Amino acid sequence: MSCVPWKGDKAKSESLELPQAAPPQIYHEKQRRELCALHALNNVFQDSNAFTRDTLQEIFQRLSPNTMVTPHKKSMLGNGNYDVNVIMAALQTKGYEAVWWDKRRDVGVIALTNVMGFIMNLPSSLCWGPLKLPLKRQHWICVREVGGAYYNLDSKLKMPEWIGGESELRKFLKHHLRGKNCELLLVVPEEVEAHQSWRTDV
């Protein structure tokens, strides 16, 4: 699984005040080159310093040492187009685990209070500057709760997309999981994964 190149502005974060009674401060990292995995991770942790490109590159090299044959090869593979193994290993360095969601299961059994956030891999339109091409590639996005509501923190969005409460979130997840080539990861603390307390049907 990989992410879609994006020729937009450089990655940047914004503290956005959204129109609510008590506007939450939301960290939303924007897309730069092929670094959507990095942006999704930082958006999950709501921290611009949670991970860097160098951190993910070190993890990638550790997981795939035999792929780093020459400096040219290293440059070609080190473009930030990271797969699920890098994301899972990165989360483990922070004491978290990525639980792969079986799409045959009902999202209604997810124990949302025990899940810090969600990372989704889904098809996204391929763009070149302002032009949208008739092609799609896989893209990493983050969804998480901030200030009592859930937001889509896709790094390609201009600002966080409000989803709503728990019922709206489940509808959002169901909608995307019905599509082709969509995968869902639950980001949970290690102890939650160990006891499988991310689910209510155990």
From Swiss-Prot:
Keyword set, alphabetical order: Cell membrane, Cytoplasm, Hydrolase, Membrane, Phosphoprotein, Protease, Ubl conjugation, Ubl conjugation pathway
In this chain, where does the modification Phosphoserine occur? 15
- Pfam families according to UniProt: Josephin
User: Primary place of residence?
Assistant: membrane
Q: Which GO terms describe its biological process?
A: cell motility; endocytosis; membrane biogenesis; membrane organization; protein deubiquitination; proteolysis
**PROSITE patterns, from UniProt?**
JOSEPHIN
Top enzyme category: hydrolase
Q: Which residues form the active site?
A: 36, 139
The UniProt PTM text for this protein says: Monoubiquitinated. Ubiquitination activates deubiquitination activity in vitro.
Substrates-to-products reaction catalysed: Thiol-dependent hydrolysis of ester, thioester, amide, peptide and isopeptide bonds formed by the C-terminal Gly of ubiquitin (a 76-residue protein attached to proteins as an intracellular targeting signal)
**Protein name listed in UniProt:** Josephin-1
Which residue numbers delimit the Josephin domain? 23-202
The cellular component terms of Gene Ontology attached to this UniProt record, alphabetical and capped at eight, are:
cytosol; membrane; plasma membrane
Q: What does this protein do?
A: Deubiquitinates monoubiquitinated probes (in vitro). When ubiquitinated, cleaves 'Lys-63'-linked and 'Lys-48'-linked poly-ubiquitin chains (in vitro), hence may act as a deubiquitinating enzyme. May increase macropinocytosis and suppress clathrin- and caveolae-mediated endocytosis. May enhance membrane dynamics and cell motility independently of its catalytic activity.
Its annotated compartments are: Cell membrane; Cytoplasm
GO MF annotation: an example? cysteine-type deubiquitinase activity
What EC number(s) has UniProt assigned to this enzyme? Answer: 3.4.19.12
Subunit record text: Interacts with beta-actin/ACTB.
